[in-house]
């Protein structure tokens, strides 16, 4: 790093800070969540991501301590109108997704109580 910067007539300083750990879903819990999502939303509305994502998520602390499954709940308007990104002051959630999320979590809790 410093040699590359020196070659351009500059100085460089590298500082690496500890961040969140990897977020890894538990297969057994993920299977339950996937099944519940397919029952509630239909198979054509459930996407199981297999490829790693380079983002970070503080839920990784929970997942490291207990079997878990992190999932996303879509909140785009059903009419297909554009949606701003999350964590944006212009983001306007379609509040109909709240009931869907509550129903999804209720199904998950009831299913996981029987494991």
Task: Give the role of each language-model region.
Residues 1-115:
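Metal-dependent amide/peptide-bond hydrolase catalytic core
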């Amino acid at each position: 790093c410093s040699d590359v910067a020196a070659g351009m007539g500059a100085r460089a300083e590298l500082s690496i800070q500890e961040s969140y750990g990897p977020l890894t879903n538990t297969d057994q819990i993920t299977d339950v969540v996937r099944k519940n999502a397919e029952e509630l939303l239909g198979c054509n509305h459930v996407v199981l991501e297999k490829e790693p994502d380079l983002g970070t998520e503080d839920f990784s602390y929970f997942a490291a301590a207990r079997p878990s499954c992190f999932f996303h709940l879509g909140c785009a308007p059903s009419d297909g109108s554009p949606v701003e990104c999350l964590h944006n002051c212009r983001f306007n959630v379609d509040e109909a997704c709240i009931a869907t999320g509550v129903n999804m979590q209720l199904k998950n809790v009831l299913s996981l109580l029987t494991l």
